[in-house]
Amino acid sequence: MYPIVRLLKDAVLASRQPRLAPLDTHVSRHHCWPWDIDIWMELNNGRTLTLYDLGRTMLTLRSGLAGVLKREGWAVAVAGTSIRYRRRIKAFERFEMKSRAIGWDDRFIYVEQGMWKANGDCANHALLRTVVTDKNGIVAPARVIKAWGLDID
């Protein structure tokens, strides 16, 4: 089940936070709820990816990319993910998630995300290769970055 309540809550919170520059970091705070856990009473790996999806969504809202995507008729997709699980997040534990775009090449925009425990330990860390598409296929990141308002010259 997709966490629609969490999505709505995060969207409301993100709308009340200051706008981010394109390469700034979105920080959100979460709890590991019973519906997030696996049989070992810790955050399920699949739910981790879902929470990262929510973090990227809020990043696009706060940075203004969501408006650019809507205006241009573009969509975003994850083309690849590399994730490292380092520490367990147990049921009811609080954690912080950080999401930021870190760069791009001629086809992809790269996003870094991490979940951090209250004691400062990195619970998991992901590097995502994302792509912006339109009806004709992949949109060049330079075009996206320019529409997003970042001067790349």
Regions found by a protein language model. Give the residues of each.
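Hot-dog-fold acyl-thioester-processing enzymes
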Residues: 1-77, 134-153
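HotDog/MaoC-like acyl-thioester-processing domains
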Residues: 1-16, 89-96, 100-153
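Generic, ordered loop/turn and secondary-structure boundary motif
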Residues: 36-38, 44, 86, 90, ...
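Hydrophobic beta-strand-centered segment that forms part of the acyl-chain substrate-binding groove
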Residues: 59-103, 125-130
